[in-house]
Amino acid sequence: MSDKRENYLSWDEYFMMNALLISARSKDPHNRVGACIVNSDNKVLSVGYNGLPKGMNDDTFDWASSGEKTGIKKDVKDYYVVHAERNAILNYRGSLDDLKGSTLYVTWFPCTECTKEIIQVGIKKVVYLRMYSKKELVDISKIMLNHAGVEVVCYGIDDITKEEVESVTDDVLSLAKKLSSLGYQAYSFSGGFY
């Protein structure tokens, strides 16, 4: 009989928890989305969360539809926020050919624009936690993924609420903040703390 611990995370649990943890970096007060791209050897290739493009100030633009800061009134954040899936693809520093055959773990089902990029780079499996709220766009994404031969897997249950997902993310964020306040720091292998 083995003495190994029995209640460890499965690979799917591990990578989805990675996506949830990554989503905690998003400053969007309404939709925190995280993505994690993994190769067939269970190695994380890249991660991303929904946020502004690099170099843009989070305080300069509206995170709501008010248009107070930009003068644009309808779904203003949709014009400038980079989605988690796209950020994960853009953050990858190797050849995009390396993404062929990989798996994407994402906290929300991909929109149509992200779906196009997922297909284009050759990701072959999408594991999502929560369904995107716009049914028509979900249906279009599903059709595209199906036609491209991308396997789609719902991790858990389709009717998990946004609040339930964000509650887990908040718990993880709370733990990270608590560890930080206790003096825990991340150690850099290149020497020193960051």
Model feature map: region roles:
Residues 1-194:
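Zinc-dependent deaminase catalytic domain
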